[in-house]
Each structure stands twice: as C-alpha cells, then as structure tokens.
C-alpha cells in the first residue's frame, strides 16, 4: 500500500542521469573553449597568439562537430531509457528528441569524415604540431595544480600522456600504411574528446573547489567532475586499445563476404 520509491534511488538511473549531466556540461564547456579560440584568432593583437588560436580551432573543430554529436545522441538515448516504455511513445516527446539528435551525426558531414579530417589533415598533416598546442596547454595546467586538485590533475596527466603516445604511434604507423588513418580515426577522435572533456572538468573542479560551501551549484559541479573522472574518462583505455589494434582486422573479409 505504500507509494513506490522514486526511480532516482536506483543506481542505474543515477548512472544515466550523471552521464547525461557530465557529458552535456562538459560539452558546453568545450564549446565555450573553442569559441574563445575563435575570438582569439580573430581579435588578438599578437600575431603568434592569433596563429596558435587558428591552429587550435582547426584541430578542435572536427572534435566539436563529431564528439559533441556522438555524446549528444548517447545522452538523449539515456533520457529515453530513464522514461522506460514512456520514452518510446510520442506523449512525452523524448522519441522525437532522439530523432533530432541522430541527424546531427550526419548533416555536418558524417562523423567518420570529421574523424578523418582530425587525424589525416589536422594531426598527421601538421606532423602533430596542432595537437601539441593542446596537450602542452593541458600539461601546463597540470603542472600548476595544487595538492587539492590532485584527484583531477593526476588522472588528467595520465590521460594526456596516453593521448600523446597514441598520437605518436599513429603518426609512425600511417607512414607505412595509409589505411591506418581511416581505421583509427573514429576511436582516436573519441580518445581526444574524452581527454578534452577531462581538461574542461578539471578546470571546472578548480573553480568549484575554491568556492565549495558557498553554493550547491559548486557542490554539484564537483560531484559531477568526480563522476566523470571515475566512470567516463576510463573509456579511453578500451578506445586506445582499438586504435592500436590497427587496420588488419578490417580487411579480413572480401567485399562479397559482407
């Protein structure tokens, strides 16, 4: 006869809600970061600063287009799943949101093409120089982090080291086999995206730590940052393993065997 518990008591519902929150808020921060580089590239009075910002924009644009839309669909499907059967019917509108998000992976140029642009033109095309702008900035942030930020700066340092090693591996492999570029591009873009979001969340955590106790807003940011580092950033390890698996397994079947 008692009322049922609200579904937020279920760990899996909390997992989905926190995944939505962490990816959406991380994506907003990353979008703002890219927008800041656009402004810097256009308005900075220093030529060196403008050039660096232009190269960062070139590097990060395919990540913004593809990773945000891939994660956007994931979070929208989580929202549908939380509704249960009601998420599938028209009454609540969630099924339409899924359709609306699905097209975003296609109409800016399919996300596979965005990934090819990132790896082929921006990373390999620049000899890794464009990506070093970004990874060096993250490493400078890590070096400046105090002990209180260590729970975020240490895994961020490991993530950016992994990204640099993966980039070097791909630069080397692509010299002998151009198929490696296409085989690795989507997973590489996702490794890049998760690492970029980790940087955004570390920046937000630094602000939240300085203001904790002032407002629930900052407590929420800090808790979400901890969730991101604990549950989402580790995805880079399986993705990196897929990149390093190479292109061979993609060519084991003839076209007629598909």
Residue ranges and their predicted role:
Residues 1-16, 22:
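Terminal amphipathic helices with adjacent charged low-complexity linkers/tails
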Residues 23-29, 37-51, 74, 78-90, ...:
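Secondary-structure transition/capping motifs at alpha-helix termini
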Residues 25-64, 168-183, 204-219:
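C-terminal helix-coil-helix/basic helical segment that borders enzyme active sites and/or dimer interfaces
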Residues 33, 55-133, 223, 227-253:
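Alpha-helix capping/hinge segments and adjacent helical runs
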Residues 36, 77, 120-121, 200-206:
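Short glycine/serine- and small hydrophobic-enriched flexible loop segments
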Residues 125, 141-258:
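C-terminal amphipathic alpha-helical interaction region
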Residues 135-141:
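Short, charge-rich amphipathic alpha-helices with coiled-coil/heptad character
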